[in-house]
Amino acid sequence: MDWDDILARSASTGAAPDLIFREEVQKAVLACLSLQEFFSQAVLQGGTALRLFYGNPRFSEDLDFVRKEPGQPATLTAHTAQIGPFLERQFSFIDKAEAVIQKQTATLERISVRLRGTDPSANLRLNLELAAVPSRSNAPKILRYPPINPAVRVESPSEILADKVTALLFRPYLKGRDVWDLHYLLEEHKLTIDWIMVAQKAEDYGHQTADLDMRMGSASRRLAAEGPSALAQEMPRFLTPATLQQYAAVFPAMAAATARRITKFQQGRERGLGL
């Protein structure tokens, strides 16, 4: 792929060249890892999974992985040396690509992929993280990245929803991307929140679960109060102008609808319905 291909896709979709390029790098890294059988041990999660495999219109930033099974050994940093040369072969306009280990502990591995190109927009940093927690629901899927079209093991939408709810309950701040993804999964995919999986996720990440009901109430109120501004502040970075134009006016309604779903979930739990 050359830079003209990036510019042509940008012109046809309305997305900024740097967004198009980042997504192509994400695909290339996933292909590289798949060829090294990384997905026999690990699972893609988060916003990139929603974007590439479940039709979410928002672009994503980094690549996040978890282990395929509880207690199963998995390593991301072992593949560091292969990523840079693979990317240089995929993109003709890249002068240098390298992957650098930033963190390697028993609970988290992080790699920073750095690219430098002839065009300033081709200078990019992409973070990869592998958390030592298990996936609860996943399957292999084919990534559209010809001619390789690699198999990538991906969390199910229900598990991604559980991840997003867990983040909503325990993160000390609200991400606009999470509000968008929650609305997308709850309203567009019509999913229901799996309470058992949320509790499992909370425990996996070392959180106390005794106060989940209280946290759900707080999260619902925060969504309603802060969700519209979080969406307005963050989503212009991750949507095409045409998509943003359609959704910007309904950001308050999106946040309110998502807050109502969280409240309904909490009330159902209090009545023992296990929604």
Model segments located where?
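Glycine-rich beta-strand-to-loop/alpha-helix junction loops that act as flexible
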Residues: 45-48
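Anion-coordinating catalytic cores for phosphoryl-, nucleotidyl-, and glycosidic chemistry
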Residues: 60
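Structured mid-to-C-terminal alpha-helical surface segments
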Residues: 1-42, 53-56, 68-275
